Amino acid sequence: MLAFLLDKHERSFYFVGMTKGEDTKLTVLEAGLDMASQLGLECVTIGNLAKTTNLSKSGLFAHFQSKENLQIEILNYAAQSFSESVIIPALKTEAGIPRIRALIDNWIRWSYELTGGCIFVSASADFSDRPGKVRDVLLHQQKEWIDCLRRIAQSAVQVGDFRQDIDDDQFAFDLYSLLLGFHLYYKLLDDAETRKHQETALVRLLDSYK
């Protein structure tokens, strides 16, 4: 499967048939994702999540054991949400440019729905120079996402929407750079013309690979 699809054990945790404890943990992860989106993943702690969710600090510690484990669980939960909201729906769209456009629209919608925007963007800035397990998880997720962009470019070649000699690594770089630029203009600069500029840049990008 493509990027961000969790393994069988992880998927079973987040879906149906959860125990009361697992349901509580899911509630905490949802609150943690929202907090990480607004304040940054580094600001999410067992203590402040306990206050936000009105749960005991000792109860949350029993679930996560450490701040690092909590942050990793939030990243895994975010990855599952990203897969369900962005990647899987796009893969159900016609291969080629329609699929690329669906992926971009889904990414933008998913980022809109998070108060502070894409958690992977903010977490990458926070942890890029901080070795450790959280960075390792984030790095793996981002590499899978970039590989997903490569694969979608390859599928566009296969259906004839892109020319045969494209560099799919360059395409992944170009498309992700476009999305990161969109995120900056929309979230920080609050530019009303962001979506218009994004569409213009996307058309130019797609045309360059035809």
Regions inferred by a protein language model and the residue ranges of each:
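Helix-turn-helix/winged-helix DNA-binding modules
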Residues: 38-41, 62, 163
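All-alpha amphipathic helical-bundle segments outside canonical DNA-binding/catalytic cores
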Residues: 136-140, 158-174
